[in-house]
Each structure stands twice: as structure tokens, then as C-alpha cells.
A protein has these predicted regions:
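Bacterial N-terminal signal peptides that target proteins for export
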Residues: 1-13
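Bacterial N-terminal signal peptides
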Residues: 11-21
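C-terminal region of N-terminal signal peptides and the immediate post-cleavage residues
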Residues: 20-37
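A general alpha-helix detector
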Residues: 35-38, 56-59, 73-76, 92
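Extracytoplasmic/periplasm-facing segments of secreted or lipoprotein envelope proteins
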Residues: 39-45, 50-51
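Short acidic, glycine/proline-enriched loop segments that cap or flank alpha-helices
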Residues: 45-48, 64-65, 83-85
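Amphipathic alpha-helical segments that form the core helices of the histone-fold
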Residues: 53-66, 78
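Compact alpha-helical subdomains of small soluble proteins
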Residues: 68-120
Length: 120
């Protein structure tokens, strides 16, 4: 067996496995039920109903998708729910993006990367 045949014999299976992993990955899918359970069971948001909770979550997705800064989204949520707690706001953002618009996870991570909570 010559060198090029050996290289091809070793490279082809590795490329096949790598391509199968990339091409075979299922797309991220929204899970509205998980979102609703997580934000309606958790105290503090007090959505009037499931439609209001979903609408609010989709607004968060729109904000993140349009490039609104993490700081701005956090501030709006804190204001809307009259709650200064960073954890409460970030929980809602994470639930919305992870469950309703998972394709935006990368954008959320980039936006939140340099976020620093305000000093009390």
C-alpha cells in the first residue's frame, strides 16, 4: 500500500464521522411547554395567563434577535416586573431564549458576555 492510499484510507473514515456529526445534528427546537412551566410555576412573574407569558417570552426573543443589549433587556424586565433582582430577570431571559428561540443562544451569550450587575 502506497503512502497516498494509506492516507486516504485513514482520512476518509474520520471525515465521514465528522460530517455525519455536523450534518446529523438536529436543529434546535422551541419548547413552549417547558417555558410555560418554568415561568408560571416560579413566583415573581405573575403572568395573567399562558398567552401573556408566551407573548412576553417572544418579546425577549425579539429583543435578543434584534441585537438589543443584555443590559437593556435586563433593565426592561426588572422594570416590567418591579423587581430589581438580577437572578429573576436573567432567569426569564434564559428560559425565553433556551425554550422559545434556541437558535439565538449564541447571540444571547455574546450579548451577556460583558454584562456586569449594577453596584448596589
Amino acid at each position: 500500500m502506497n503512502k497516498s492510499t494509506l492516507t486516504a484510507a485513514l482520512t476518509l473514515p474520520a471525515l465521514t464521522v465528522a460530517c455525519a456529526g455536523v450534518l446529523g445534528s438536529p436543529p434546535a427546537r422551541a419548547d413552549t411547554v417547558a417555558y410555560l412551566v418554568n415561568v408560571t410555576v416560579r413566583p415573581g412573574y405573575n403572568f395573567a395567563n399562558a398567552d401573556d407569558a408566551l407573548s412576553y417570552g417572544h418579546t425577549v426573543c425579539t429583543d435578543i434577535g434584534s441585537g438589543r443589549s443584555y443590559d437593556d433587556v435586563m433593565g426592561r424586565i426588572k422594570s416590567d416586573f418591579n423587581n430589581p433582582d438580577d437572578y429573576q430577570a436573567s432567569y426569564l431571559i434564559n428560559q425565553a431564549v433556551n425554550e422559545l428561540c434556541p437558535a439565538l443562544i449564541w447571540q444571547l451569550r455574546n450579548s451577556a458576555a460583558n454584562y456586569r450587575p449594577p453596584q448596589s
